[in-house]
């Protein structure tokens, strides 16, 4: 027999003996509820035994419903089974069992074995005793069940919390692993891109170098082909012949000018000599001839390369004066032309006329010329002099001014000329200089006279 209470289902069963309809001994009370509390118990007397009815009454004012449960009092014990399938706020099912071997029903059972009937007073006393012991047992069961429920809920909460923390830890580890793999991928990608860029740059540089080499070889090949074609066509040979002819013509012009200049000077000197001999009458060019030589350490230096008489020297001087006057008034000679200036200075050196009035003015004007080529040509011409004796004071003064020139090439040429000329007069220990004047008479009867010599140390 079962009775349903809101949130609780209570069932009580009684097992009877088949022969005498007497209840057998039950093992105990099984209760599945948190609020299964008997409020009232009634005992009802039956024909063949004693059957007890327990009524559970709940105050309806508090929102509860009263239910009844019928049971049987047996001599060997009692058996109560309460089934709770959950309350309004919980769906959990709890089962509890209670077995009391020293219950008051045992006395009742033993008494039922000895006598067949109970008095009403005894039944009431037993009922009160059962009620009090059952309430205490139910209270203990409820406290135990509540503690057990709280413990289980706490364990479940801790388990859920632990699982949540574990999941968070796994998720964090996965995120860290994903980030690490991402960084590794980025690093590998960066290395790969760097290698690719480096490789591409090297390839481009090699390609440009190859192109430059090809272009250079092609240009050389084209130039060689053009030169070969030009040579095969005869143009290069014609150019060489033309250049050679230009050089030869310029050389011939220079030689012709020099020869013409020398011829004019020779004609002037011859005319002067003829005039001089015509005035003297008895004198002849072969009367007296002499030449001066310089000996240094046994080596002879000819100051005048040919035999020159006193009359010839005078004639040369007069011819030079006439020539210098003619050159200063002529328009055909340009002093600013380096080639003509060198030729003119060389002629003056050969005539030993560097100390003349016209020569001094010429050297002074050319040495202070603003044209660099003119000053350089004058320095080169003066450097060709055989000795300082030939240059004289005017020539050496011009060289000294040119040695201090602002132009490096001019100053270097003048300094080198001065050093070369100075070395001729440097006397070392054991050196000796001797000037010799030789006179030769043309007469066949006279013998040669030796001239006096001066030794200088």
From Swiss-Prot:
Tissue expression profile of the protein: Expressed in leaves (at protein level).
Any one Gene Ontology cellular component term annotated for this protein: chloroplast
Domain of life: Eukaryota
Protein's UniProt keywords contain Plastid: yes
Keyword Nucleotide-binding included in the entry's annotation: no
UniProt transit peptide range: 1-57
Family according to the record: Belongs to the ATA15/OSA15 family.
Function: May be involved in the regulation of leaf senescence.
Protein name: Senescence-associated protein OSA15, chloroplastic
Classification lineage: Eukaryota, Viridiplantae, Streptophyta, Embryophyta, Tracheophyta
């Amino acid at each position: 027999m079962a009775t349903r209470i809101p949130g609780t289902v209570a069932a009580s069963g009684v097992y009877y003996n088949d022969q005498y309809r007497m209840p057998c001994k039950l093992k105990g009370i099984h209760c599945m509820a948190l609020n299964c509390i008997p409020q009232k118990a009634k005992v009802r007397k039956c024909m063949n035994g004693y059957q007890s009815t327990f009524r559970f009454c709940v105050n309806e004012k508090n929102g509860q419903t009263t239910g009844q449960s019928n049971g049987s009092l047996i001599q060997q014990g009692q058996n109560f089974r309460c089934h709770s399938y959950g309350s309004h706020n919980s769906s959990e099912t709890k089962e509890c069992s209670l077995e009391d071997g020293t219950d008051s029903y045992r006395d009742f059972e033993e008494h039922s074995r000895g006598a067949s009937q109970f008095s009403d007073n005894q039944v009431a006393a037993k009922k009160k005793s059962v009620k009090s012991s059952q309430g205490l047992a139910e209270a203990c069961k409820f406290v135990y069940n509540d503690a057990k429920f709280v413990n289980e809920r706490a364990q479940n909460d801790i388990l859920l919390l632990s699982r949540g923390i574990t999941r968070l830890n796994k998720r964090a580890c996965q995120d860290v692993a994903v980030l690490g793999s991402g960084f590794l991928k980025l690093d590998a990608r960066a290395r790969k891109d760097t290698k690719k860029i480096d490789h591409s740059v090297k390839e481009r540089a090699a390609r440009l170098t190859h192109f430059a080499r090809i272009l250079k070889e092609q240009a050389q090949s084209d130039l060689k082909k053009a030169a070969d074609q030009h040579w095969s066509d005869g143009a290069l040979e014609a150019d060489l012949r033309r250049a050679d002819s230009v050089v030869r013509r310029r050389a011939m012009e220079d030689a012709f000018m020099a020869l013409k200049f020398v011829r004019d000077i020779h004609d002037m000197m011859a005319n002067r000599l003829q005039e001089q001999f015509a005035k003297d009458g008895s004198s002849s060019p072969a009367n007296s001839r002499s030449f001066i030589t310089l000996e240094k350490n046994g080596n002879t230096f000819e100051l005048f390369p040919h035999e020159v008489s006193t009359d010839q020297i005078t004639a040369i001087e007069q011819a030079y004066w006439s020539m210098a006057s003619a050159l200063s008034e002529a328009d055909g000679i340009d002093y600013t032309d380096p080639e003509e200036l060198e030729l003119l200075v060389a002629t003056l050196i050969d005539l030993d006329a560097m100390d003349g009035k016209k020569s001094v003015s010429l050297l002074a004007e050319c040495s202070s010329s603003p044209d660099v080529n003119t000053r350089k040509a004058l320095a080169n011409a003066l450097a060709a002099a055989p000795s300082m004796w030939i240059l004289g004071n005017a020539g050496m003064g011009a060289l000294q001014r040119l040695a201090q020139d602002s132009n490096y090439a001019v100053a270097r040429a003048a300094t080198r000329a001065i050093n070369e000329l100075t070395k001729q007069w440097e006397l070392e220990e054991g050196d000796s200089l001797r000037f010799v004047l030789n006179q030769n008479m043309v007469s066949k009867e006279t013998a040669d006279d030796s001239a006096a010599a001066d030794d200088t140390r």
